[in-house]
Amino acid sequence: MKRFIAVLVTVFTCLLGANNAFAADDSNALQQIKESGTLRVGLSTFVPWAMRDKQGDLIGFEVDVAKRLAADAGLKVEFVPTAWDGIIPALLAGKFDVIIGGLTITPERNMSVLFTHPYSYSAVQMVASKKLASKMTTIADYNKRSVTIAVRSGAYPVQTARKLFPKAKLRQFDDETQAFQEVLNGNAQAALASTPTPEQMVIKNPESLFMPFKKPLTRYATGFAIRQGDFNLLNFLNNWIQVRTEDGWLNNRYQYWFKTTDWQNLVNENN
């Protein structure tokens, strides 16, 4: 009996130590950020979430969000531009503290990272070639082996394409500009992207492009992403999102970047 009790005490002590270790790790990220005085933000450039202006500085919805978040916390902000298909691995490797980059909340991604509550919502739309697809107006028209659809690698529209157009050939690119160029060059019938980019591309190229569907193909929520276990940081970020949602600031920035074109003359044409 004494031996059994001794074993139980040992097990309990180990579990208590493990819990204390987890608790220490839990507060580690937020404490480290406070001590460093800088919030490191991972993002990938794509219009109008994040892009370069004519002076080479980052601007966009996510840039505004990250700057306001850091300012409210009394921190400096450091942006870490990262290729989209490698942004989650970079977060897990400690290259930055948080992803603020229009990252769609999905169960698959949630297996690797912690997501905050949504801070914005978006949708996926299709842009098609007038030359190659003028008579294609249904999902079935694009769900054929003879159809090529261009998308940005690692982005949520990839999932939409695979779900709705499993028979089509999917061609993936490092950025959306290349995907749309593939359609303009006549190498793909269509491209998928998050709004408002498809609408803007049609406005810029009315003679070449059109939108075959009036309603979005899918809708989705976006959240900040942090490393698993950083629950104190998660609590802070969720509370910040709630405060800036309730006071209307997030909606104000969303309306400016997604519902107007007032900012377009600021943008570097190479974005």
Q: Regions from the language model: what does each represent?
A:
Residues 23-25, 156-173, 212, 242-271:
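Ligand-binding clefts/hinges and TM-proximal coupling segments of bilobed small-molecule sensing domains
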Residues 39-40, 74-76, 93-101, 146-148, ...:
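Alpha-to-beta junction loops
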Residues 86, 103-111, 160-163, 182-185, ...:
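A ligand-binding cleft/hinge motif common to bilobed small-molecule-binding domains
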Residues 121-128, 195, 199-241, 260-271:
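Periplasmic-binding protein-like
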Residues 63, 79-89, 171-185, 220:
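Short helix-initiation/N-cap motifs at beta->coil->alpha
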Residues 129-147:
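Flexible hinge/capping segments at coil-to-helix
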Residues 24-102, 111:
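Extracytoplasmic small-molecule ligand-binding "clamshell" domains
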Residues 43, 61, 114-128, 144, ...:
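Short Pro/Gly-enriched coil loops immediately N-terminal to beta-strands
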